Amino acid sequence: MGAEGAVRGARPVPVRAQRVPKYYRLKRHLLDMTDTLPPGTPVPPERTLAAEFDTSRTTVPQALQELVVEGRLERIQGKGTFVAKPKVSQALQLTSYTEDMRAQGLEPTSQLLDIGYVTADDTLAGLLDISTGGRVLRIERLRLASGEPMAIETTHLSAKRFPALRRSLVKYTSLYTALAEVYDVRLAEAEETIETSLATPREAGLLGTDVGLPMLMLSRHSVDGQGEPVEWVRSVYRGDRYKFVARLKRGTD
C-alpha cells in the first residue's frame, strides 16, 4: 500500500496554536537585527530591550545568551554585547589549518602551548601502531585567525617513526612540511569525527570564551599513502566562531 493509501480517510490532526514566549519574540527581533547591521554594532541595553518588548529584565538575558551560544552575538566583558562576525566556514577535507585559514582570507598564526613526550596508553598505541608504553611526541598549539583565537589543537606522533622531530620543528614552522622534507611522509587519507563538548575553564581562558560554551571537538586520524598511521589530532574549536561544511554526493550503487 502506498503512502497516500495508508492515510486515505484519516482525519487531519488539529494543530494547537502555541503561545510564543516573549523571550523568543525578542530573540527573533535580535536575529533580524544581526542580518542587517554590520559586525561590531552594539546591542541596545537590557533595560531598553525589556521596556520595548514589555518583558522582565530577567527574560532578556535568556535571549541574548542563546544568540551568543549560536554565534550571532558576541559578549565582551566590561563593554557589552555586539553583533558578531560571520562564522569561519571550513570544508571537511584533508588540508592544514594554515591552508584552511588562507582560503578564507585570514592570516593563520599559532602559539605553542606545550611540547613533550608522553607514554602511549592502549588506545593511543593502537591509533599510532606502536607498543603500549611507547614514546609519543605531543604538541599542543593555540590556533589563531587574524589574531583571534579559534582552536586548541593537540597532535600526537610516534617518536619511533619520527626521531628528532622535536628538533626539526625549530627549523620548520609547518609540521606537515617537516614531515614531508625530513621524513618523506605525506598525509594521504584521514578519518575525522566531530562531536560537541563544553568549554572547560582552561579552554575558555585560552579561547576567550565563557566557561561551558558549546565547542566543536574534532578527532582526526591520518595515514600516509601506504596506510601507515602518521598522527592523531584532537582539536577543540569555538562553536560560536566556527562551522564545518561537507559536500555530499549520492553513491552510484
UniProtKB/Swiss-Prot annotation:
Induction and repression of expression: Actively expressed during vegetative growth.
Gene assigned in the entry: dasR
Cellular component terms (Gene Ontology): cytoplasm
A biological process from GO: negative regulation of DNA-templated transcription
Residues covered by the HTH gntR-type domain: 16-86
InterPro entries per UniProt: Bact_HTH_transcr_reg, Chorismate_lyase_/UTRA_dom_sf, Tscrpt_reg_HTH_GntR, UTRA, WH-like_DNA-bd_sf, WH_DNA-bd_sf
Protein name: HTH-type transcriptional repressor DasR
Source organism per UniProt: Streptomyces griseus
Source species, domain of life: Bacteria
Taxonomic lineage: Bacteria, Bacillati, Actinomycetota, Actinomycetes, Kitasatosporales
Function: Global regulator that is part of the nutrient-sensing system. In the absence of glucosamine 6-P (GlcN6P), represses the phosphotransferase system (PTS) specific for the uptake of N-acetylglucosamine (PTSNag), and genes involved in the metabolism of chitin, as well as several genes involved in development, thereby linking carbon availability to morphogenesis. Regulates the dasABC transport operon involved in glucose-related morphogenesis. Essential for development.
DNA-binding region, residues: 46-65
Keyword Transcription: yes
GO molecular function, one term: DNA binding
CDD domains linked: WHTH_GntR (cd07377)
Keyword Transferase in record: no
Subcellular location: Cytoplasm
UniProt keyword terms in alphabetical order: Cytoplasm, DNA-binding, Repressor, Transcription, Transcription regulation
